[in-house]
């Protein structure tokens, strides 16, 4: 709620979650005066280490309260999703099953595969009413993580956000997702992954900042997790990003897909340009030939049925019935036990 500087700032950094209060909380290793002396850079305490800075830029803070009361209320909400310790499971709230169909989900994904939509609308329809509690809401917004309840059961949600950068995975999104997955696994909180990912963000900036090792953090976190892990693919599931986002190939317990799902190495146009490159180049009308091959590839792979026939998808579900399927899936997997090999600890690619 107040300032924290110097060596003392590593104390909150070691905790599971940090909640700051806007206007009064500051965190930095070296304060504005030292920064001015060493680098001649003038910066205020708020700009250097205030709540807004650590919520959006650094991602150090997980929540920010408008005032002290709001901060305390956020803490209470957070604790309500957690067990007392790592040897217990979170308490289930009373819930009576009713009509769990959600008709609005049937029209939530646009027909145009390149048109964005807000994944939080999907989350709010799948989870219990007003139960989603987002973590790091202003940092790496192309991935959404947070706690929710499903028929009273506490779960962790990791979802790609098509409304931001088309939902791609980048360095910050990978780190954000990996940390949340590991926390949920540490405290026996089941995981729901909602996937619409076109791939990893390309470019020199990402490569030079270690997208390989950072993307591997998310992969490692999912592979290491022993809690129930269930995935719903709403639209795109392309390439390595598909594998990383809790696919069957890395041990997911159940994978569902909507009819709009596209599970492939890449999008139809990009794949057609590579696979049929010679044929397109030698054609009298390359543009027309590309279009034909794009449609051919899309008909074969821009659907979930080919993947389902290979066992990568357990069931293709109607969007409106997804919540009902998830309630049953988490109930079935609630007694999941995994015997891990004896070791001191794993070596996540930090």
Describe these PLM feature segments.
Residues 1-350:
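Ligand-binding clefts of soluble mixed alpha/beta catalytic domains
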